[in-house]
Amino acid sequence: MARLGVNIDHVATLRQARGGTEPDPVAAAAIAEFAGADGITIHLREDRRHIQDRDLKILRQTVQTRLNLEMAATDEMVAIALSVKPEACTLVPEKRAELTTEGGLDVRIHQEALKLAIEKLQAGGIIVSLFIDPDPDQIKVANKIGADYIEIHTGSFAEAKSWKEEELELIKIENAVKLARKLDLGVNAGHGLNYNNVKKVAAIGGIEEFNIGHSIMSRAILVGLDRAVRDMSELVRYA
């Protein structure tokens, strides 16, 4: 049975739009956990456009499930992670001009820097995942440099323009899961998943956790966060 990690970045985005104190991502995390979330995911970006250092520090004290910190593999972020000690860190690519994370890490090009970050984080007792496209070469290098997990970038599947294209992307994801499992890598997935498409990916099997944010927060505006999390949790667990 797969787990659901709820990404609360968009709660912080709404707060930062006015530069005030509400809505508070810390409160949203508590509601999500009460509703059945298995973990809370946040992305502390270098430009601090949504989640702030204050959020991370308080969430480390209040999250009762598990805290997953998405971050760039920079010296600053590694130092922050080692001081806060989330259960897991997911290393992601980061561009200041992007609206959200676009595509997976190119582990082949950046393997030396990623390997160093992985080693430092693991030495601090933190589980490390790499956010990558469902590409066999990327998975093999992720394993080579010592990652504990991969998180499969499901954006191409979510943005497929036709049934045929969607099926091809599902096959890529399924093959990626099989390869990762063969290499003893844990597997998570996320990006672009919503209430209409997540069951197709969850039905593949072998994916331990789905990290979902935008779709849950969009639904929460209409039905409330508790209901939105419960509905997504049911889809993920019983696909």
From Swiss-Prot:
<feature type="active site" description="Proton acceptor">
    <location>
        <position position="43"/>
    </location>
</feature>
<protein>
    <recommendedName>
        <fullName>Pyridoxine 5'-phosphate synthase</fullName>
        <ecNumber>2.6.99.2</ecNumber>
    </recommendedName>
</protein>
<dbReference type="InterPro" id="IPR013785">
    <property type="entry name" value="Aldolase_TIM"/>
</dbReference>
<feature type="binding site">
    <location>
        <begin position="213"/>
        <end position="214"/>
    </location>
    <ligand>
        <name>3-amino-2-oxopropyl phosphate</name>
    </ligand>
</feature>
<feature type="binding site">
    <location>
        <position position="18"/>
    </location>
    <ligand>
        <name>3-amino-2-oxopropyl phosphate</name>
    </ligand>
</feature>
<dbReference type="GO" id="GO:0005829">
    <property type="term" value="C:cytosol"/>
</dbReference>
<comment type="similarity">
    <text>Belongs to the PNP synthase family.</text>
</comment>
<dbReference type="InterPro" id="IPR036130">
    <property type="entry name" value="Pyridoxine-5'_phos_synth"/>
</dbReference>
<feature type="binding site">
    <location>
        <position position="100"/>
    </location>
    <ligand>
        <name>1-deoxy-D-xylulose 5-phosphate</name>
    </ligand>
</feature>
<comment type="pathway">
    <text>Cofactor biosynthesis; pyridoxine 5'-phosphate biosynthesis; pyridoxine 5'-phosphate from D-erythrose 4-phosphate: step 5/5.</text>
</comment>
<keyword id="KW-0664">Pyridoxine biosynthesis</keyword>
<keyword id="KW-0963">Cytoplasm</keyword>
<dbReference type="InterPro" id="IPR004569">
    <property type="entry name" value="PyrdxlP_synth_PdxJ"/>
</dbReference>
<comment type="subunit">
    <text>Homooctamer; tetramer of dimers.</text>
</comment>
<feature type="binding site">
    <location>
        <position position="7"/>
    </location>
    <ligand>
        <name>3-amino-2-oxopropyl phosphate</name>
    </ligand>
</feature>
<feature type="binding site">
    <location>
        <position position="50"/>
    </location>
    <ligand>
        <name>1-deoxy-D-xylulose 5-phosphate</name>
    </ligand>
</feature>
<keyword id="KW-0808">Transferase</keyword>
<feature type="active site" description="Proton donor">
    <location>
        <position position="191"/>
    </location>
</feature>
<feature type="binding site">
    <location>
        <position position="192"/>
    </location>
    <ligand>
        <name>3-amino-2-oxopropyl phosphate</name>
    </ligand>
</feature>
<feature type="binding site">
    <location>
        <position position="45"/>
    </location>
    <ligand>
        <name>1-deoxy-D-xylulose 5-phosphate</name>
    </ligand>
</feature>
<feature type="active site" description="Proton acceptor">
    <location>
        <position position="70"/>
    </location>
</feature>
<dbReference type="Pfam" id="PF03740">
    <property type="entry name" value="PdxJ"/>
</dbReference>
<dbReference type="GO" id="GO:0008615">
    <property type="term" value="P:pyridoxine biosynthetic process"/>
</dbReference>
<dbReference type="GO" id="GO:0033856">
    <property type="term" value="F:pyridoxine 5'-phosphate synthase activity"/>
</dbReference>
<feature type="binding site">
    <location>
        <begin position="9"/>
        <end position="10"/>
    </location>
    <ligand>
        <name>1-deoxy-D-xylulose 5-phosphate</name>
    </ligand>
</feature>
<feature type="site" description="Transition state stabilizer">
    <location>
        <position position="151"/>
    </location>
</feature>
<comment type="function">
    <text>Catalyzes the complicated ring closure reaction between the two acyclic compounds 1-deoxy-D-xylulose-5-phosphate (DXP) and 3-amino-2-oxopropyl phosphate (1-amino-acetone-3-phosphate or AAP) to form pyridoxine 5'-phosphate (PNP) and inorganic phosphate.</text>
</comment>
